[in-house]
UniProtKB/Swiss-Prot annotation:
Source species: Candida glabrata (strain ATCC 2001 / BCRC 20586 / JCM 3761 / NBRC 0622 / NRRL Y-65 / CBS 138) (Yeast)
Protein topology in the membrane: Multi-pass membrane protein
Keywords: Membrane, Mitochondrion, Mitochondrion inner membrane, Repeat, Transmembrane, Transmembrane helix, Transport
Pfam families membership: Mito_carr
Entry GO MF terms: thiamine pyrophosphate transmembrane transporter activity
Protein name per Swiss-Prot or TrEMBL: Mitochondrial thiamine pyrophosphate carrier 1
Length: 307
């Protein structure tokens, strides 16, 4: 457990290397979890369906390639998001160390910097997140071109269509990354300190290795309701409603019209019950735990390779 931790407070890390390593880790994570991401989004935006029904419907209507629906904007989003997240984490950390004398613990430092990095990466990659959501929500088997979807959003909603729900997303992602980096570094620091005081290293070595999955599980579970609401907001004004599984949910989506984030959340609870905020949470955890672990692990791997 004596390897360099590139996310630790006071570590001197190249912002350029962090940007490159973050982009590569984002692409690597996306490649591994794309099918799970598609199913998770389907569950979030389609009321009343169950996991098994979604899986069967995708296979029947779209075939196996349906699980990679929106993979191009999804991959671009993960590359931009990963690069912006880790690159801004390093840059913001360097700025705070140089311009401010923050007398805070490494754990709190990770929460603060992680939150700012999360909001930065969310804003930078958000248009592709909107595209990814609309591609994944599409229930028809025919191939949709990225250019056509971009032009449809531009024609019907204008520039702001690519940033639908962006404000709430930045809060959601900021909170998510604050928890993720905070828990990750807390576990790393705890295990390193305990291993120095104990002759039995194995339990702490295992916990150290599980820092990524645990941080992913904790952050996703804590912020999932916010993520579900923002997914609904992202497709409520979609110019291609007929593509989505919304034949029996049009009245539900009409009730979201002109409502802000909190209003949509309240409407979901009133019409579908409190558990609607956690629709797809099982699939999300199955996706997010390995995704976060892969992202953090591969980031450290690429950083070590880049020197």
């Amino acid at each position: 457990m004596n390897k360099k931790d590139h996310l630790r407070k006071d570590e001197e890390v190249s912002t350029t290397n962090s940007l490159v390593a973050g982009s590569l880790s984002g692409l690597f994570a996306r490649t591994c979890i794309a099918p799970l991401d598609t199913v998770k989004i389907k569950l979030q935006v389609t009321p009343h369906n169950k996991n098994a029904n979604v899986l069967i419907n995708i296979l029947k209507r779209e075939g196996i390639r349906g699980f990679w629906k929106g993979n191009v904007p999804g991959s671009i989003m993960y590359i931009i998001y990963g690069g912006a997240q880790f690159g801004s984490y390093t840059y913001i950390g360097s700025f705070l160390r140089g311009g401010l004398d923050l007398n805070i613990s490494p754990q709190l430092y990770s929460c603060l910097v992680g939150s700012l990095a999360g909001m930065t990466s969310s804003l930078a990659s958000y248009p592709f997140d909107v595209l990814r959501t609309r591609f994944a929500a599409n229930s028809q088997g025919q191939l949709i071109k990225l250019r056509d979807e971009i032009m449809a959003i531009w024609s019907h909603e204008g520039l702001m269509g690519f940033f639908s729900g962006c404000g709430s997303s930045m809060i959601n992602i900021g909170l998510n990354t604050a928890i993720m980096f905070g828990v990750y570094e807390s576990i790393k620091i705890f295990t390193e300190e305990r291993s120095k005081l104990s002759d039995r290293r194995d339990p702490f070595t295992l916990l150290n290795e599980l820092a990524g999955p645990i941080s992913g599980f904790t952050s996703k579970l804590a912020t999932f309701p916010l993520d579900t609401v923002r997914r609904r907001i992202q497709i409520r004004n979609s110019p291609n409603e007929e593509r989505h599984d919304r034949e029996f949910t049009k009245d539900i989506y009409k009730s979201y019209k002109n409502r802000r984030f909190l209003g949509v959340g309240i409407s979901m609870v009133q019409q579908e019950g409190p558990l609607s905020l956690y629709r797809g949470v099982t699939m999300s955890l199955i996706k997010s735990v390995p995704s976060t672990a892969i992202s953090l692990w591969s980031y450290e791997l690429f950083m070590n390779k880049l020197g």
